[in-house]
């Protein structure tokens, strides 16, 4: 009985701390244009990202890409003063396919056993390309993304290639009903540390969008 109560107390504390930790993490700024349940249209401000290209399937690429960029932000870098500097962790961690074989048609498949993936972190807003420390690992690239409009589907739970493709399909169908077309690759973003309980996790499928002018006539 005591053990049961102890577990419940730990669970309650953990459930409280994890969301608070995520809330304290800096995220890219955006304006909410429209919301329908878990589906949203957003206008993102320009942002600076650190990215790396990784070969393999989605799970392999996510792990390798995360470790490479984490190594950079934890101090494997050089400033203009010649020293290293830790960069504050941000959310989310994003992965997207970089294979010409993946199209934006329905049904969509993100299963690429020998594909190439881009894994990226958004950098803290205080940095610019001129002020951010440079990575010592030449695999890591720094890039500024311009302001853009993005369609989003938020979901919780574990992430795998099958449910990611299913969510992407759901998002594209919703966009089609709203007379919107995709303008880039499907992206998967994860906001939480790996120890977060599945039902507390925040994941997002996203893609840039524009009006489908062909259907307006």
What are these language model-derived features?
Residues 2-217:
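A solvent-exposed interaction/effector surface
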